[in-house]
Amino acid sequence: MTATADAAVPAMGRRTFLATMAGVGALGLAACAADPPGGGTLSLTSKLPTAVNPKTSLAISIVTTQLELQASGQIGKLPFKVSSWPNLTAGPDVIEGFRAHSIDVASNAGIPPIQAHSSGVQAKIVAVSTTNKPIYQFATAPGSDVTSAAQFRGKKLAFSQGQAQGVVTLRALKQAGIPYSDVHLVAMTSDEFLTALEARQVDVAVLSQPETTEYINGFGSKGARIIYTNVVDYLEILWSPVEVLEDAAKAAAIGAFIPFWARASIWAWEHPAQWIQTYYVGNQHLTTAQGELIVKAQPKPAFPVSWARAIAWEQQTSDLLAAAGYDPKFDVSVLFDRRFEGIASAAVPAQYRE
C-alpha cells in the first residue's frame, strides 16, 4: 500500500479496514495451520485447568519469545508441544491467522483485539505487559515548520489505523486538544512512514528506533526534526481465539506458556548484548549499533498484578477509535479473559511487577 492523497478524517473507515484484512489470506497461513482442538470443551466461565497434557500442541506466533527461550536455554522445558512459530506480527495478519485457525496464541499491542472484535473475530486477552516509557517519537518532513504537537493542526499525519502508531497519533491529538477534523490523517502502514516523510508526502509520522536516529542523521540538515511527547504505547498483550480457549487442553497449555513468555522477556532485558546479537543482528539483520539504539529505547518489562488499569487504557483506546469513526464503541472488558489475570505477575520477581 502506498501513501494516499491527503483526505479528511477518517482516512480509512471500518469497512476499508475489514476489506483489507480479508485479503491477507494470501499469506499462505493454511500451510502452518494450528492443530485441531484435542481437549474437552471448556466454558469461558469454567475454572481454568492447570494440568497440562504434554501431547497438547500450540501454534505460537511470537518469534521473539521463541528466540528468547532458545537463547536462554528454556525452550526445551515447555510442558507441551509447539507445532509452529508463525512469523506473523502485524495486527491484521494475526487476526487473519485467527480466522484461518492457524494461530493459537499471539502477541500484539492493545489495538488489534479491538479491531478483531469489530470484524467479528472472537478472541480474548490472556496476559498483559505494560510500559510507562514512550518508545515512539514524531518526526517531521524535511523543511516542515512543525516544532510541537500543538502545531499538528492542518497538517498531514501518517496514520496506520490498526497499529500502535495510529493510537499514539490519536492520543497525541487528544492531548494537544486538536479535533480529528482539523488534521489530515493519511492512511498507510507503518513501514511506509519513513518513505512518506522523506518524500514530503506527509508532514509528520510516528517513528521508533533505530529509524528515528537514522532519519535525523540523514535529513536533520534538511530541516527534519524529532518531536518528543509523553504519549506511551502502554499495552503489550497475549491473546488467543475463543475457540482455542474453549479447548481445555489448549487453555491449560496457554496458562503454562504465560510464565515462560514473561520470564523470557525479562531474560532479554537482563542480557541486552546477547539479545542484540540473537535477535536484532541474527534475525532482523540489523547492525549491532542499530540493535543498541533499539534496546536503549526499550522499557523495563512490567507485569500488572491487576488488569484494572490495562482495561481502562484499552477502553480509552476503543473510545478514541470510535470518536474518529473507525470502530463502534463497546465495553472492552469483554476482551479480557480474567481467569488468566495474575499468572504472568506471579511468575516474575517483584521488581518486574506493576
Could you tell me what each predicted segment is?
Residues 319-354:
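Conserved C-terminal helix/tail region of periplasmic/extracytoplasmic solute-binding proteins
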Residues 248-328:
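Secondary-structure end/capping motifs
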Residues 73-76, 91-104, 118-120, 150-151, ...:
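Short helices/loops that flank or line small-molecule/ion binding pockets
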Residues 85-96, 109-111, 183-198, 210:
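Short helix-initiation/N-cap motifs at beta->coil->alpha
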Residues 45-49, 55-100, 117-119, 167-174:
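Short, polar/charged alpha-helical segment
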Residues 1-12, 20-30:
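N-terminal secretory signal peptides
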Residues 111, 192-282:
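Pocket-lining segment of extracytoplasmic ligand-binding domains
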